[in-house]
């Protein structure tokens, strides 16, 4: 979901690795241990939660989280909670990283000190207010000044203990006076619309005996200030909770009698002091935040066209895509946007075939084919993740769930056996699990996605042509990906492939490790399988699988998935679970009385239907066939005073649903829109608000069947597997080329050196693969020109945006230090560029 900004789309995403916490304060009980979990928050909205690590003051989480960020935010925060089964979970501490500081920690493991959490540390939100100073004549004929302070509204206030009933106090304060007034309480909203005006008499001539006339300009303007405090009205005995404050000196009225601005709320000046950072422990994180500013498609045509013809360039090492892989620090950086771009334009198979064939030609030993982290290997990995994720789930998820739920002991290392465990029983348990997983894989060939099969066919042909004396190389070239890089890693770490929500427990993790090792060896078709294990107990266990039927099953499977032109008519017809989870739904009006209006339900989406159930595994309470989904749109918060709501519109009614957070709401809207995109009766207009009390809240139309009053949002690609924005991927590639511009220039030098010098290669150029210096130089020149043109467009956009930026507007409230730094930097840049 992109934020539109005058024709330019802004995409935000974050990839997080939550490592471990250390030296948490001990629990004040006899055990001193804690049961802790970590949450990821956009400001204070939780978007992810790790598993609970029990009885530890140094919990290891080892969890990964990725999301597209659908809204603006100021801080990426991480809270460490201590679980309490009897009371509300307590916060131990938090890490808050300002959005502008995220690049400092980009893709680096970093230890952060946990900070104390109190009312002042949790301040967030902004306030819109107006000040107006006017002269009035009193009944006695004396002229005095009156200040009108209007509190218009607030946005994004924190939610305290699940609720927010805010009010504001407005105080005119000076050295010798303090006069306070209070707004009404606004119930159940963190975006209150106050629109209240308070009047203060600024000058009081009678109180000044030494002067017959009071000079506002000379005396009061530097001494008085307006202070606005936001509070959450509470029924608890501890009193109302502080939400934030702002202070405005009346000197802002020197130039004009009126003033209007947005302000960020701030903590109190005398807020409670934090504990020493090392009192609360620390948290290890790795954060990759990406922000893409994407222009319209025509801006990217030169660079995109250059990339898309990479498969046709001879040699392929002189192509723009291959050059990107050469200059990036890690091949994975280049592979991700390249594969997505080529998939979007249907060019991934010829491109991967070209670079894989070139790699095979450089390989000397058939036993090491595709074993390195080359661009070809990384591109195939990425293609399997994108195109094969549903195939992976259909194939492995039932077996993985059974292993996690049955929890049978499978330890076969005699040294690690627990008391009471039997080695033979454990071996039999493990053998049954391996058989179940192995057969699930080898019988899934007909479901393998076509794009993967086409790539495997090209790998097989290239390997067989290069190593004609090795009859098995046509199998190992394919198995090195489908087994070694696809199935085995998914079995080993199912949470990384969304097969499980979190890391598995230690016993299950050990079982999956043993299964993964065995399946990987079975798939490798190694001639000396027992010798491939370092551990003697694994070699002993593998004797169970020395029968020829296992090798035959692997070969039949590999033959099937690497066949040319195979198409599976059943693959699209099979029900595929696309997304599931708990959400809140509103009753659809079948019973008007005696029923709770909002209920928690388990939702499940397949490529056939959208259903909800009382709980996971139950029979569906309601089902919507995909062809009956006419539109999926956000629902305005004012409809039910609830955030993160959306509507699934059907022919007869709309189903109103509340997701758990903004990220989850975006994910559901996107996937539901995708699967219903091809429906012939999709709506073009809809009602953005609910139908309540006999009319639509948005347009006031009385009929529940009245046509919509707002246009439906733009559709997404209909392919249920892939949602790729070609312009965004080209922008990503531009950013990488721009980041590694010095390497591009160095590569140009290397081409020139190779063209004129025939001797030993200079060491500084030896890292580049340059088969044809002239062709490579030609492509480099085009790449640098394309990147330069886009860089100029970005620079012009920044200059134009800076000219239009107003400090104190709703988009850029006063009080953001990082924005002040931005203003200063842009001012300096503009000065230098004149």
Curated annotation (Swiss-Prot):
Molecular functions per Gene Ontology: calcium channel regulator activity; GTPase activator activity; zinc ion binding
Q: Which residues are recorded with the post-translational modification Phosphothreonine?
A: 110
GO BP annotations listed: intracellular signal transduction; negative regulation of Ras protein signal transduction; platelet activation; signal transduction
Kindly list the positions at which Phosphotyrosine occurs in this protein: 66
One short Pfam family name for this protein? RasGAP
Provide the protein's localization: Cell membrane
Q: Where is this site: Arginine finger?
A: 371
Query: What is the superkingdom listed in this entry's lineage?
Result: Eukaryota
Gene3D superfamilies referenced in this protein's UniProt entry, alphabetically: C2 domain, GTPase Activation - p120gap, domain 1, Pleckstrin-homology domain (PH domain)/Phosphotyrosine-binding domain (PTB)
InterPro entries per record: C2_dom, C2_domain_sf, PH-like_dom_sf, PH_domain, Ras_GTPase, RASA3_PH, RasGAP_CS, RasGAP_dom
Where would you say this protein principally sits, based on its record? membrane
Q: Where are the zinc fingers (Btk-type)?
A: 679-715
What residue ranges are annotated as transmembrane? none
Amino acids binding Zn(2+) = 687, 698-699, 709
Q: Which SUPFAM superfamilies match?
A: C2 domain (Calcium/lipid-binding domain, CaLB), GTPase activation domain, GAP, PH domain-like
An example of a Gene Ontology cellular component annotation for this protein is: cytoplasmic side of plasma membrane
- Keyword field: Acetylation, Cell membrane, GTPase activation, Membrane, Metal-binding, Phosphoprotein, Repeat, Zinc, Zinc-finger
Under what name is this protein listed?
Ras GTPase-activating protein 3
Encoding gene per record = RASA3
